[in-house]
Amino acid sequence: MKRFILSISILISISFQLFPENITIASFNTLRLGNNVKDYRTLSKIVSKFDLIGLEEVMNEKGLKKLKAVLNSTTKSEWEYIISEKAVGSKDYKEYYAFIYKKEKFQYVKSLQNFKEINQNMFIREPFAARFKSNNFDFIYIICHSIFGETEKNRIIEASNYDKVYSYYSNLIPEEDDIIIAGDFNLPANDLAFQSLLNNNNLSYVIDPYWFKTTLSDKGLASSYDNIFINKEKCYTVSLI
């Protein structure tokens, strides 16, 4: 995501209509969690609205531990997190991915680690995934933070590779057909570069870039770079915060 003088990501979420209760899943670019001053109490109020949140730009585990501690002390739920096994990025900048979630909502949680590239440099930050089970709904959740780069060409190349990410995790657990891909893609989801991901896997994006912007700059809503890709046949509702 291109940053201006002041920039944050809007948190996007989906709610799955399950029996006997719904679960809400969100994606959030935390803007260097652990490396700068954060109002963790305010952040926890936002995060606590959801059951499972995929986090990008986690700089270290210290920030996650602090967020978890505040959530546990200010909500009625017990919270836990998974952090990616390695930091990803360039030699000058690296970050972790993480999931933070309400323990009572999930009976099974397992890290599937970072995507293993077929060819070197498919992604500047290889996506990270985990498998979750909530009541009768089990799924793989993949989170991503695409390159911004010096030109749009870099972003297009990465976007065209997300079909391979989907296939990688699908092949890793062949019996799992519920796979969610979310994050900060630095391109709108209706870009042609995402067509292979959408068409080959019967997916749709939940935020229409034509109507909704998801990135805030010092000048207001700037672009629609954050999104969630999900099976077209799933029942869900969408919200922006």
Regions from the language model: what does each represent?
Residues 23-30, 46-67, 100, 141, ...:
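Active-site beta-strand/loop signature of hydrolases that rely on acidic residues for catalysis
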Residues 27-38, 117-120, 149-154:
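Acidic/histidine-rich helix-loop elements
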Residues 21-24, 48-52, 76-80, 105-107, ...:
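Loop/turn elements at helix/coil->beta-strand transitions in domains of secreted/extracellular proteins
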Residues 54-55, 82-85, 179-184, 205-210:
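Active-site neighborhood of phospho(di)ester-bond hydrolases with catalytic His/Asp-centered motifs
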Residues 4-16:
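Sec-dependent N-terminal signal peptides
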Residues 22-32, 110-112, 138-148:
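Active-site-proximal beta-strand elements of phosphoester/diester hydrolases
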Residues 61, 167-177, 187-241:
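Metal-dependent phosphoester-hydrolase catalytic domains
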Residues 59-137:
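Structured beta-strand-rich core segments of catalytic domains in phosphoester-bond hydrolases
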